[in-house]
Amino acid sequence: TAKLINGYEATLKALPDLQFVSLTAPSVEGVDLPDRINRMLKVSRQVQDILRKRGTLLVGIRKLEVTHNAEKNTFHPHFHFLISGKQNATALLDEWMKRNPTANRGGQNISLADNNTVHELFKYFTKLTADSGKVNPQALDTIFRAMVGKRVFQPCGNLHKVQEVSEEIEN
């Protein structure tokens, strides 16, 4: 985490009009989590490609995060982006919603990033404890298995990549 913060913080904070964007889709059961994550990653790439072809280069970073609802035993994969420019963030959200008609518009968010946002983004990709403070090993196993080979963090546009940092989940 410290390597990620040190590697990206200055570059991200130098971006003009940095926006924090949350993009979600409906929660799923554990058996459906790998497919949901794969679909979300595919749609994210499609949206970025479409916007680039229209002349909008999204510059920033994407984070894939998964939370577990212990009461319902469902999983909620979602993205957090730090993107330069409110107009770009809005275009990202609009294109995401076009491709995710079952997503609740109220679950999506755009807000101006502040000094804490970069640090918060790099904290974790899954919450390791429930509200009770107990770790659910089965839920964590489901999340980790679904995340094998997936990038938790992905730079967008011409954001400079950090050297010597691997954030992929390995077998």
How should each PLM-predicted stretch be described?
Residues 1-75, 85-171:
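Right-hand nucleic-acid polymerase module
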